[in-house]
Amino acid sequence: MAAGGAQGSGGARLLVCFLGVFVCYFYYGILQETITRGTYGEGEKQEKFRFALSLVFVQCIVNALFAKLLIQFFDSGKTDRTQSWLYAACSLSYLGAMVSSNSALQFVNYPTQVLGKSCKPIPVMLLGVTLLRKKYPLSKYLCVLLIVLGVALFMYKPKNTGSGGDEHTFGYGELLLLLSLTLDGLTGVSQDHMRAHFQTGSNHMMLYINLWSSLFLGAGIVFTGELWDFLSFTERYPSIVYNIMLFSLTSALGQTFIFMTVVYFGPLTCSIITTTRKFFTILASVILFSNPISSIQWVGTILVFLGLGLDATYGKGSKKPSH
């Protein structure tokens, strides 16, 4: 009975984590597009937002403050013994993955970038197996394969051979995506190591990774001079400050659920949730805007739901209890 109650509690917690990540990052995506793709000013003086590093810097600061509040109210009696260099390494790989992914958009189109990032569970699993000697049940491999394949099919769009304008060979963009995926895997390995050896709490993980990220990004935007251009831009268009703060708040809430998922279920489950979140966001867009779904996309839909269902039922069969 106790085991059944524990499984029920774990299932409810996983559902809360999934819904938290989905809702927060659904609005996060809308705000991100509003900020980065919107035009500011009128007539010939219209400007675009060009300060990606500064935006992430504000985001990391708010994340760290939010995590500090959570620790103050919920984890004040818990001592964190995780070594600082692990947080620093994890933040470097995390930032490197973000920068590589965003830079790839200069060379490949957005669907290619999203499709590449949808394979994130693969490096998390491969590096977990090779570096940490971690063992996953065969069912976990099959679930990840089904989910990645389903997302890939859903996002796949046949190339229009008649247009001829979107042709490109394997180059810098694809290499940057591979680098981003590798760094994603290293981030997952670092988080797994912290959980296994130091029982790192989700709020402490969120606080210190974002503090280190803020330190690295702060040095970067001061060194490049982007900080002063960003502040000048917000002075010219003060309305953007509201969107940036709301964007950062949804990021902080989303990261709370992400780190909670990492601590209780591991980085692989977290990567599965974040990958399928993209799928559900696109699916919601299709429903809301009445966009047609092709037969291939319906196959992808079925595969994703099948993978999620099988993972919930069999994916944790040999997993040891979390401390």
Curated annotation (Swiss-Prot):
Signal peptide: none annotated. The chain crosses the membrane at residues 15-35, 51-71, 85-105, 136-156, 169-189, 205-225, 253-273, 286-306. InterPro entries: SCL35B1-4/HUT1 (IPR013657). Keywords: Endoplasmic reticulum, Membrane, Sugar transport, Transmembrane, Transmembrane helix, Transport. GO terms for biological process: transmembrane transport. It is a multi-pass membrane protein. A motif (Di-lysine motif) lies at residues 319-323. It is found in: Endoplasmic reticulum membrane. The keyword Cytoplasm does not apply. Pfam families: UAA. GO terms for cellular component: endoplasmic reticulum membrane. Disulfide bonds: none annotated. The keyword Transmembrane helix applies. Its main location: endoplasmic reticulum. It comes from the Eukaryota. The di-lysine motif confers endoplasmic reticulum localization for type I membrane proteins. Probable sugar transporter. Belongs to the nucleotide-sugar transporter family. SLC35B subfamily. This is Solute carrier family 35 member B1. It comes from Xenopus tropicalis. The lineage of its organism: Eukaryota, Metazoa, Chordata, Craniata, Vertebrata.
